[in-house]
Amino acid sequence: MPDVARRDLNLLPKAHLHLHFTGSLDIPTLRELSAWEGLDEAEQLIDDDPLSVPATKRGWWRFQRTYDIARHVVISERALRAVVDAAARNDAAQGSRRTEIQVDPTSYAPYVNGLVNALEIILDEAALASRRHGIQMGVIVAASRLHHPLDARTLARLSARFAGRGPGGVIGFGLSNDETEGNTVEFGPAFRIARRAGIPGVPHGGEFRGPHHIAQVIDELHPTRIGHGIHAAESPALLKRIVDAGITLEVNPASNVSLGVYPDYSKVPLRTLLDAGAQVALGSDDPLLFLSGLTDQYRIARDYLGLSDAELAELARMSIRGSFAEQADKARWLAEVDAWLAAAPESGPGLPAAGVVPVPGGLVARPSGLLVPERGLVAPPGNGGAESADAGQAVPDARNVTPGL
């Protein structure tokens, strides 16, 4: 790669709007949690095969097992707090001013005496971690498509009790997991409960299914943002509808490629969305499993999709505008983006999205600062092969893989 003058993307002020709870873990924290609980799950996850091969070769069930292994170490109040703190710390180091992490507290309720306790612990730590790391962290409560729609209503009512825009508040209500499961229409009442409490909807849609599914999500759930929504690029009419409605799309390039939605980074249709006028917020989805942090998504946009620093700055502005932060905070962060762009760029070779730097202890530091095990590194797919899907198509058994939220 030729020498170019580039600004440091870790210093670019931004908001992180698509981040799942257990998937936000880094390897050192995962190891620490395993040691606390006297478990060996971390070594299974790190030393065995699941993280050493691309997700497109693992398949859905193997990927589900990988996520479940990580989730099995989050079995105490101490662990819940550690996950939140690590997410805030890692995002702050990557320039995030506002992180909106999503969680299904149902997964952790058995370990802390109930659903209310699980959510209160997470919210309390989100407020503490915000102050500790100089970042705002809001919480999205996400229902699962794999659970009964009545469970989603329970979560919506619980969310209403803790609604609030500031750090430690429930700032959004989501719906995630396997898009092929569940009837979107049946989750509509839960989203109505949330809206009546002033909580905006942020459901997943259009990660593996096409424009028709995204349109159904819009019709039935009335979202303010859509998690993924990447296949909207295939329908100019749908894209216009999204733009006219002011819906922000949470796009996760590394996740899309790792799961076989697109064969390589250059095929992610980010430019199509931007050229149509869509509001886009880049997110990492599950850094633990995709070995790719928030800043890495901006590097992918720069190094593989050719976005300039001015365009990257506008992406950061979109993420801030798409957040549920107070307007005064947004104005301050937007001014910081302007200052980043006005500063003189650094000279030297730009780091590719997959660049890594060896560090002691058998770990490597990605450009974003995320520490991952050396043997767990996954190079960006893109060399084709039987395991790669055609653009816009999912591999047969690669489905939405965020069960733990």
What role is predicted for each listed range?
Residues 1-199, 208-213, 220-225, 231-377, ...:
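Metal-cofactor-binding active-site regions of metalloenzymes
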Residues 382-385, 399:
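Intrinsically disordered, low-complexity Ser/Thr/Pro-rich tracts
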